[in-house]
Structure formats: C-alpha cells, structure tokens
Amino acid sequence: MDGLATGLAILIAGFMAAVAFETNQPGLGWLAIAIIGAGVGFLPYNFRGRKPAVIFLGDGGATFLGFTLACLAVKGNWADHSPIVSFSNPLLIFGVLIYDMIHITVERVATGKVRSIKEWLDYVGKDHLHHRLERALGSRQASVAMICLMTICLGLAALALRDAGTTEAVLLLGQACLIVAMITILEWSGRQKR
C-alpha cells in the first residue's frame, strides 16, 4: 500500500530516536535518524496522494526497514530504572504492527486458514489491518492515515514513559490494550452488520 511501510518506518524511527536521546543512547538515536532521512527522501516518490507511486520498497526494502528497526528496539536500553518501562517502550512504539500480527495469526488459526507454522509463514492474504481499514474507510489513503495516527498515539504514550514508574507503565500498556480492544470490537461489529 503506497506510503504505508515508509510512513510507519519514519514514525517508528522518530519515536525511537526521541526515546534513545532521552535515555542517553545517541548511537541508537543517530541510526534511527538515518532511517528517518532515508524514508523522508523516499516517501515523495512512494506516496503521492491519489496518484500512483513511482517506486516501491518491495519485500527487500520493507524487510530491511523492519529488521533494522527491530534490531534497534532489541539493542536499546529504554529505561534504567524499571525493566517494565524498558520493555513497554518498544511495545508501544511497535504496537500497531504487533496488534496486526497477533490479530491475523489468531484469526487465521481460528478459521482454519493455517494449521502449521509453515502454513502460517507461507500464508499471504488480504486480512492485514491496512486491508481491513481500506474496506471499512473506503480508500487506501484513509487506511494509511488511520494506521499512522494509531502509531502516533501509541508513540506519544512511549514518550510519556520517560520518567514513569512501573505503575504508570502498566497503566499506559493497559490503555493501549483497551484501544486495541475497541478497534477489534469495531471491526468485528462492522463485519457482523454486512
């Protein structure tokens, strides 16, 4: 979907850079900024509003961005004072992607579309969040915008964790789970009405 992977990479790298600099990890921050720069240079050719994209990331480009961002998330020490806060930061920043992966896995297993790990890895379908939102909202641009807005909401929660304790981290994760639950309920009820 035009602009989705690039836009998410820019947002996720932006939140990771902000948290990295806040937690005194400038090396990770600068790596994240490099990803932002690459994405900003690529985005005008990949997302052109109602016009079709001129270039695409392809599987290689999207996989590289995802792998690099995941490596930054694993490498980082996102909080010194609480392991829960340190664990919560990447969970919130990557929250939309994690939600999509869990949702489609549960749905594919529950409906019998996949029966083994190999089938799960090989399965390609139009049941990802961006496809579901495109059907619900009526356009690809609206779907991309909605996913980016959800990523911003969860990323802002990650920024709020800077000086948070364990209780605040658990509350922010709980809030994120409730937002995801509301989205799931709305999706499910929309499907039932068709």
List PLM regions with ranges.
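Alpha-helical transmembrane segments
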Residues: 3-194
